[in-house]
Design a protein with these regions (language model features):
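Ubiquitin-like/PB1-type beta-grasp interaction modules and other compact soluble beta-rich domains
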Residues: 1-78
């Protein structure tokens, strides 16, 4: 399957890009994050992130489909 991945904040910094298209056999955000975390060296544990698919927040075991847009959102701070 092909996915459009969007990264924000420190994840985008670490990946060196804000988005990428990736071919993967991952069938859940959990599996896809494990793959890209290893590839890009992401340090965040999955429990600290939010994930959205096609504009809606979903759980880590949500079933992915070809051409889904997947967004991994790290915690942000500010004031």
């Amino acid at each position: 399957m092909n996915f459009r991945l969007l990264y924000f904040a420190s994840l985008a910094d670490r990946a060196g890009r804000a988005e990428e298209t990736r071919e993967s056999a991952a069938d859940t955000p959990r599996a896809l994050y494990a793959e890209v975390a290893s590839l890009h060296g992401f340090a965040f544990d999955r429990e600290r992130l939010r994930v959205a698919v096609n504009g809606a927040f979903v759980g880590w075991d949500h079933a992915l489909a070809d051409r889904d847009e997947v967004v991994f959102l790290p915690p942000v701070s500010g004031g």
